[in-house]
């Protein structure tokens, strides 16, 4: 291939993958894209004569697609990208070329860029980066973020300017992403590959209600056009932005030498998991805005800033097998079984392959050396085989078209569906097993005495034909199992506990009953919305899909799934037998979903409360449920709209932000007082001794 042909091929590939990164589903990793772009840059530097026309190395990003449903609007000031370096030698070269009295270092967040235009303190526009000159108008979606105020609030030191563009990154932090994907998996929905895709997709939703469902956050990292605002430094600009009520990174640091910059690069390379969000690099900026102006910019990036990109956290291991798991709604999910490997902070031995199409697309063979990456710090991802290490002993994996649990032929539920499912929903032991363990989980009946082994024993001992018989279990039934009986065949302590827990579960809230039924797509969020609207399971069964879809929190897909579920005879038998056994199928009068007996369901109504750090008597889920049971909103991030921050040990950045914004901080004792008596009146002191909380 000629040099000219290689240049054209690389240019086409870079443009293709950049378009997918911003407006579609990426096909390659960020590291692979960076390698493509770097090869193109190196080739252009060695052979400048091959560049014909515009090169993607000089472009900020692709222009918004012509088919976009969003209005295209010009930025007041061009919104540039950043150049990258990939090792300390390259960084040292940039520092030599860009001497400064003070540098600013900040974490490079892997999210979706946004440009906020405020005129006289009012939010006028929110735009995507677009091609750097023109972005898409996503104002309606931006307004759903708690971190983006409609109105800026000035101070004596930092009055609100006539006009200012504030640049930032919309993202989903690691903890929220894990919870969101777990919820989607529980509801049978497709999981997101990584937080960046989830955040970027959320900001380009046509319906802002869909955007609002995702736990989006914002960190501001720059300014564009401005009138009536002339900060001396980037650091001063961040102080002003924070004073106006917008979030800035708690990890930003001023340093005064190239050596200190390199120390920050080394530090964050060893502590990248300490940040609440995903980060793939460290951004270094010249702090002085006057010096920035003197240095200027190229057509795509400022000369006064650089991004040091850390290597992605990948590792090589051996693929031993590919197995197929059957979920509670019948979805067949292939997963890789690997030699255990420590990567991204934990040891992994399995990785999902999502569906048969994805499994075959990866091109892995049994016995392969494979490259894995922890995607989103939660889901191990198989990137592909290391073909150079193949010995010839590897063998292909043949995806069976039959259910590994019951032998029924697998098939997509509809044409074009990438997921294959076992249609034997009633009698497949694999589906029954996962349904039993799911209904026993904390998000449903919370029966801790019914684990995976116990569920397996109940099924394979012949004690349970399906979950409809669960609440009819007697001591003599459990004595037929190994999990709940002594060697002498008498009921053991676990069996006694199970019977007690089953009795308690009969009084569970209506929303928990709905979750326990394993209706496809119905998780706790949708179940709570339904339980607030309807009085009983029978009311829900009688409702039309259209009526249910009109409820906030119940999408059309969920509504249709519920309607379909109640048309199946054996599903109705579950409801009937549970009711006959004494399971409460109605919402108690005045009982808000999730509320405990005797709790005032309006005690915290209208309050937004954030919990951070470790509490002695509450885990994160219990604290959230306690707040919601009393009518409050349990938020994931601190903003001007936050009423209280509950700070346990190692509270970290959220505590600092709350203090900066003047949000009242509660220790655990004060939190318990709040749950008992509600918020203090306006004349009371709402703050507690935050000094006693470790940062």
Swiss-Prot record:
Mind listing the UniProt keywords for this protein, alphabetically?
Answer: DNA damage, DNA repair, DNA replication, Ligase, Magnesium, Manganese, Metal-binding, NAD, Zinc
Query: What are the catalytic residues?
Result: 108 (n6-amp-lysine intermediate)
Kindly give the Gene3D superfamilies that the UniProt entry links to this protein: 5' to 3' exonuclease, C-terminal subdomain (1.10.150.20), 6.20.10.30, BRCT domain (3.40.50.10190), DNA ligase/mRNA capping enzyme (3.30.470.30), Helix hairpin bin (1.10.287.610), Nucleic acid-binding proteins (2.40.50.140)
Cofactor dependence: Mg(2+); Mn(2+)
* Compositionally biased spans, kind Low complexity: 679-695
Q: Does the keyword DNA repair apply?
A: yes
Which GO MF terms does the UniProt record name? DNA ligase (NAD+) activity; metal ion binding
Keyword Magnesium annotated: yes
Q: Which residues form the signal peptide?
A: none
PANTHER family, per database record: CHROMOSOME TRANSMISSION FIDELITY FACTOR 18 (PTHR23389), DNA LIGASE (PTHR23389:SF9)
- Family, per entry: Belongs to the NAD-dependent DNA ligase family. LigA subfamily.
Please state what the protein is called: DNA ligase
The organism named in the record is Corynebacterium jeikeium (strain K411)
**Which gene does this sequence derive from?**
ligA
């Amino acid at each position: 291939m000629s040099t000219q042909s290689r240049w054209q091929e690389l240019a086409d590939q870079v443009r293709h993958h950049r378009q997918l990164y911003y407006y579609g589903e990426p096909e390659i990793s960020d590291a692979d894209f960076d390698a493509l772009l770097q090869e193109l840059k190196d080739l252009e530097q060695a052979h400048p004569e091959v560049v014909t026309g515009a090169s993607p190395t000089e472009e900020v990003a692709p222009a918004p697609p012509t088919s976009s449903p969003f209005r295209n609007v010009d930025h007041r000031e061009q919104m540039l990208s950043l150049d990258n370096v990939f090792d300390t030698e390259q960084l040292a070269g940039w520092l030599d070329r860009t001497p400064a009295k003070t540098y600013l270092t900040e974490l490079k967040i892997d999210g979706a860029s946004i440009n906020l235009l405020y005129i006289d303190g009012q939010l006028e526009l929110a735009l995507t980066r677009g091609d750097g000159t023109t972005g898409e108008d996503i104002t309606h979606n931006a307004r759903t973020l708690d971190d983006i105020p409609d109105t800026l609030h000035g101070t004596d030191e930092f009055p609100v300017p006539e006009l200012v563009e504030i640049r930032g990154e919309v993202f989903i932090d690691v903890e929220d992403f894990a919870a969101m994907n777990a919820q989607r998996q529980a509801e049978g929905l497709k999981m997101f590959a990584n937080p960046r895709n989830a955040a970027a997709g959320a900001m380009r939703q046509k319906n802002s209600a869909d955007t609002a469902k995702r736990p989006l956050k914002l960190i501001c990292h720059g300014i564009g056009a401005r009138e009536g605002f002339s900060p001396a430094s980037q650091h001063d600009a961040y102080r002003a932005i924070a004073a106006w009520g917008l979030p800035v990174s708690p990890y930003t640091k001023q340093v005064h030498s190239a050596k200190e910059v390199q120390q920050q690069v080394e530090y964050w390379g060893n502590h990248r998991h300490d940040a609440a969000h995903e980060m793939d690099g460290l951004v270094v900026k010249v702090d002085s805005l006057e010096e920035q102006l003197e240095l200027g910019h190229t057509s795509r990036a400022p000369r006064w800033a650089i991004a040091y990109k850390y290597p992605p956290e990948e590792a090589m291991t051996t693929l031993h097998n590919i197995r197929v798991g059957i979920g509670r709604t019948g979805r067949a999910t292939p997963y890789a079984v690997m030699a255990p490997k420590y990567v991204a902070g934990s040891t992994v031995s399995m990785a999902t392959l999502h569906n048969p199409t994805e499994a075959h697309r990866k091109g892995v063979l049994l016995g392969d050396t494979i490259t894995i990456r922890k995607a989103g710090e939660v889901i191990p991802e198989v990137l592909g085989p290391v073909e150079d290490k193949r010995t010839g002993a590897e063998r292909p994996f043949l995806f069976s078209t039959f259910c590994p649990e019951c032998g029924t032929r697998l098939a997509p539920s509809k044409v074009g569906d990438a997921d294959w499912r076992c249609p034997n929903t009633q009698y497949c032991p694999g589906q029954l097993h996962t349904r039993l363990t799911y209904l026993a989980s904390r998000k449903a009946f919370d029966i801790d005495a019914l684990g995976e082994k116990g569920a397996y024993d109940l099924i394979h001992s012949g004690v349970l034909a399906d979950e409809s018989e669960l609440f009819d279990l007697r001591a003599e039934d459990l004595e037929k199992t190994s999990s709940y009986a002594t060697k002498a065949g008498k009921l053991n302590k676990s069996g006694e506990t199970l019977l007690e827990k089953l009795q308690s579960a009969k009084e569970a809230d209506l929303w928990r009953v709905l979750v326990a039924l394993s209706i496809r797509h119905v998780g706790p969020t949708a179940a709570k919305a339904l339980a607030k609207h309807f009085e009983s399971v029978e009311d829900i069964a009688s409702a039309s899909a259209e009526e249910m879809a009109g409820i906030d929190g119940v999408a059309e897909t969920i509504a249709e799934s519920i309607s379909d579920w109640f048309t199946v005879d054996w599903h109705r038998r579950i409801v009937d037998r549970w009711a006959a056994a004494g399971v409460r199928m109605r919402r108690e009068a005045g009982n808000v979903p999730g509320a405990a007996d005797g709790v005032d369901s309006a005690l915290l109504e209208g309050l937004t409360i954030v919990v951070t750090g470790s509490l002695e008597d509450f885990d994160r889920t219990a604290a959230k449920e306690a707040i919601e049971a009393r009518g409050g909103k349990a938020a994931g991030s601190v903003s001007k709209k936050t009423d209280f921050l509950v700070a346990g040990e190692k509270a970290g950045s959220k505590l600092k932000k709350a203090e900066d914004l003047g949000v009242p901080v509660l220790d655990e004792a004060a939190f318990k007082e709040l749950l008992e008596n509600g918020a203090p009146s306006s004349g009371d002191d709402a703050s507690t001794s935050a000094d006693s909380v470790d940062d």
